[in-house]
């Protein structure tokens, strides 16, 4: 039913395509940070702690912004920042990774809570009173399947690319994921209704 619902379908497609683009490079982030960029476990863990705090604060900030604007506005802003971070990973090099990586990690974490809040609120607002659980379930299932499928494809492609591109193969995956995410935001994100 969610697929056939014209009011809900733009959000469903946005979530599914977002899963496809989001899952493509995400399995490689830790490998990229450690093996390619040469960041230490201690460094990554320390930045992870900071990003967790920023993520909690981000949820509050994005919620306040949604109160003043609309949830689709929060999705656009958080997606823009998060996709900029994804794309940014493709340009990070070991010589300046210790300066740029924390920014990318913290900004992405700060956006995660807002994106989740916005998506959940849009799903709630756009689904019918009698079918909210089914709509939420279908959206979560289809997005998860898309994310897992995309991760599997990325994992299959990366070793083949590595033979000719070396460590740049992971950078290419981040680039493709970022561009695909921006395409989704431009094509499907603009169709999201304004809901407060």
Q: Where on the chain are the PLM-derived regions?
A:
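Intracellular juxtamembrane helix-capping segments at the cytosolic ends
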Residues: 114-128
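Helix-to-loop junctions at the C-terminal end of transmembrane segments
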Residues: 58-71, 158, 162
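Juxtamembrane intracellular "pre-TM" segments in multi-pass secondary transporters
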Residues: 1-12, 196
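Hydrophobic core of transmembrane alpha-helices in multi-pass small-molecule transporters
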Residues: 98-115
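Short amphipathic helix-loop junctions that connect adjacent transmembrane helices
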Residues: 27-44
């Amino acid at each position: 039913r969610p697929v056939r619902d014209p009011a809900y379908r733009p959000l469903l497609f946005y979530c599914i395509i977002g899963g496809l683009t989001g899952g493509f490079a995400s399995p490689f982030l830790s490998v990229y940070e450690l093996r390619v960029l040469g960041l230490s476990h201690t460094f990554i863990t320390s930045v992870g702690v900071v990003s967790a705090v920023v993520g909690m604060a981000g949820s509050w900030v994005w919620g306040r912004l949604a109160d003043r604007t609309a949830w689709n506005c929060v999705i656009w802003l958080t997606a823009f920042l998060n996709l900029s971070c994804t794309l940014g990973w493709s340009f990070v090099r070991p010589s300046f990774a210790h300066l740029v990586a924390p920014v990318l990690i913290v900004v992405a974490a700060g956006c995660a809570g807002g994106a989740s809040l916005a998506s959940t609120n849009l799903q709630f607002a756009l689904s019918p009173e009698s079918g909210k659980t089914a709509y939420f379930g279908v959206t979560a299932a289809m997005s998860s399947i898309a994310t897992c499928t995309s991760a599997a494809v990325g994992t299959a492609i990366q070793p083949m690319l590595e033979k000719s591109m070396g460590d740049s193969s992971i950078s290419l995956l981040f680039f493709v994921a970022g561009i695909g995410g921006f395409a989704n935001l431009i094509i499907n994100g603009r169709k999201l209704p304004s809901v407060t």
